[in-house]
């Protein structure tokens, strides 16, 4: 068997290394400035905006470039687009950060906000046997993965708002008809935007912020006792449907709230903050039923738990939930006026 001289072997390895480096250099030249893998020193305008407006003041890291190690392989998803990610962070500021600061302070928000928000482009597909889609997932209230960001799009209606305001007070038939037309269009679109947000994103961020409170100081155990016999643990996803019962009539604002007391706490906090008084009243009407074998209606049980949460928030953290709720919801009618596509 012929042996390759040691010196020749060394030269061959050097040559291969040179070829590999050359190949890498060629691959790098094909990468665009929007490629997923980027060095920290090459920040886009969006990166700088996130760092200056979110990371530094609020201690919230927003990661919109695809990082598999942050997401895991449990879902099939895709990268978030920069333009949709910009809308997401602006919406977050408008309906979460600014209302909290208005109610408390920036220091408070830094302490009680999730530390990292991971954005992905599409709903996370859960392969068989599940065959379901995930819109958001959390890790200990510290990191939240928000999915389907590429469908998050809220074109501004500021021109329609301005036109409506210009017609205000005019009494001729043409102006009145146009005003009413604009008013209906704005309200319908605005409500559509808010509904889309609250379905997952807004409820999730308030839900997770609620966890940060009880993780530091537990509220009274009286909360846990109110519906202690009806928590379902891991069966919450199927138990209510399978048994033909409604969780709200047993004192839970959502099926998820019936998993265990901490989720009940967070779900009740989030729903109360984001639902309007009219929507909340409608929920309580649904809950105002005493199930067979029970001694109290779901409405009574929910209101008892809510009273405990409010008292705990005021006493322990100085947070007025009704003021926070008001500061969030007074922004709803003006939501579609905002332009979430620009770097402020």
Regions found by a protein language model. Name each.
Residues 19-23:
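C-terminal motif of bacterial Sec signal peptides marking the signal peptidase cleavage site
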Residues 74-82, 151-155, 188-196, 200, ...:
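Second-shell loop/turn segments in exported
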Residues 4, 24-111, 295, 308-344:
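Acidic/polar, low-complexity intrinsically disordered N-terminal segments immediately downstream
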Residues 2-12:
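Bacterial N-terminal signal peptides that target proteins for export
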Residues 146, 159-171, 177-180, 184-187, ...:
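Active-site recognition of the HExxH zinc-binding catalytic motif
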Residues 231-344:
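Metalloprotease/metallohydrolase-associated module, dominated by Zn2+-dependent proteases
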Residues 29, 86-170, 175:
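Auxiliary, metal-adjacent structural segments of Zn-dependent hydrolase domains
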Residues 202-247:
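Acidic, glycine-rich loop-and-strand cores that form catalytic or ligand-binding grooves
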